[in-house]
Regions:
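Short, glycine/alanine-rich amphipathic alpha-helical segment
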Residues: 142-146
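Single conserved hydrophobic/aromatic residue that forms the stacking wall/gate
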Residues: 197-207
Length: 208
């Protein structure tokens, strides 16, 4: 298994809304919000439109998948170059099945966020100086992931399929088989610190 940590799909959603700019981290040279993702046009409406958000999110997911696979390919190549695990490989059958292990952090958070945008009204609170979304207000009720509600669960099915399809479009190291895992606990504690929330507009905290 070529292990490769995980991708923060919740942060990716914020990049889709803010045109690839990071709402928390500044460029050291310019002092302005860092342009991390592709410089797409940000969403400027007062309330988020589901179709508009989804269209931009698809593009940002595809960019993230490409970056993710490229970095993991480099990591696995350098690992084999400088520390090939020959002792462990000696115990493996002749026909080796290699998997390319990707992962997702913030899965349920993205589902709840998209669900809030689709089924309720989400108002964007923008930074007065940068114009970037930095908080959200929700008006109305919306289905949440983990409650056996197909409206939320179907968003999760779409999200997993979309991201894994984007992963599979890329060449993986040694033609390994792309897989993904939906991770919890430690990854969501760390990754939550880099986020502002949509479905739960609070200060940064661990995401579920």
């Amino acid at each position: 298994q070529f292990f490769g940590a995980r991708a923060n799909l919740a942060k990716c959603l914020l990049y889709a809304i803010n045109g690839g700019k990071d709402e928390k981290f500044l460029d050291k040279k310019t002092g302005k919000p860092m342009q991390v993702g592709p410089e797409y046009s940000p969403i400027t409406s007062e309330y988020l439109d589901y179709d508009e958000v989804l269209a931009k999110y698809k593009k940002m997911l595809d960019w993230l998948a490409g970056l993710y696979v490229n970095i993991l390919n480099l990591i696995q190549y350098m690992h084999d170059k400088y520390y090939y695990e020959s002792a462990e490989m000696a115990l493996i059958d002749t026909d080796v099945r290699r998997t390319f292990a990707t992962g997702i952090a913030g899965f349920s958070h993205v589902i709840d966020s998209l669900s809030a945008i689709k089924y309720a009204k989400v108002k964007v609170i923008r930074n007065a100086e940068t114009g970037l979304a930095e908080d959200f207000e929700i008006e109305g009720e919306f289905p949440k992931y983990g409650n056996d509600d197909d409206r939320a669960d179907n968003i999760g099915v779409w999200l997993l399929h979309e991201f894994l399809t984007d992963i599979k479009k890329r060449h993986t190291y040694r033609n390994s088989e792309p897989t993904t895992s939906i991770l919890t606990i430690t990854s969501n504690v760390v990754y939550g610190l880099s986020l502002i929330h949509i479905s739960e507009p609070t200060r940064p905290e661990p995401i579920s």
